[in-house]
Amino acid sequence: MISAPVRVARPDDVTEVVRVTNLAYVVESFFIDGERTDEAEARALMAHPQSTFLVIDDPAVKGRLLASVYAETHGDRGYFAMLAVDPAHQGTGLARRLIQAVEDHCRTAGCSHLDLDMINLRTELPAFYARFGFQQIGTAEMGDRHKLLQECYRIKMSKPL
């Protein structure tokens, strides 16, 4: 078990956030053309005042991340996306720790609900998030479609905090 703490990402973590996110999201290459994110997007998300990335460092390699997640708050609702764990460390509880950290972060910010969405083609994800208490609350069309290789839509899930 990896005991490194969850912490708030710093601006100098952007390259590693992008690396671990793109590595984890290679599984989406059958419906997304190119990488999941880039440094410009990560910097823009990190700069937003109600947004943050939470990360877990690799205790064996200075400056390397094992996992990251994006979180934001809007009034009484929290939201997270881009949950990413280095494939070599998936199944070790890092995702669970990050989800718990997002929940704690959002509760501290005064949120009463936590939301997420996923692409319907990732058929394993609704059951994964249901294990953490999330329930499907609806669907939505995809916004930016320029990288899509297949038709898809977003599944929206939420849970009370």
Could you tell me what each predicted segment is?
Residues S3-V6:
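Extreme N-terminal starter segment of soluble prokaryotic enzymes
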Residues V85, I119-N120:
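Short amphipathic helical patch at the helix-1/turn junction of helix-turn-helix
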Residues L149-L161:
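Terminal substrate-recognition subdomain of acyl/acetyltransferases
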Residues V8-V14, V18-Q90, R96-A101, H105, ...:
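Acetyl-CoA-dependent GNAT
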Residues C106-M118:
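Conserved GNAT acetyl-CoA-binding A-motif
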Residues L98, R122-L125:
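Conserved short alpha-helix immediately C-terminal to the canonical SAM/SAH-binding motif I
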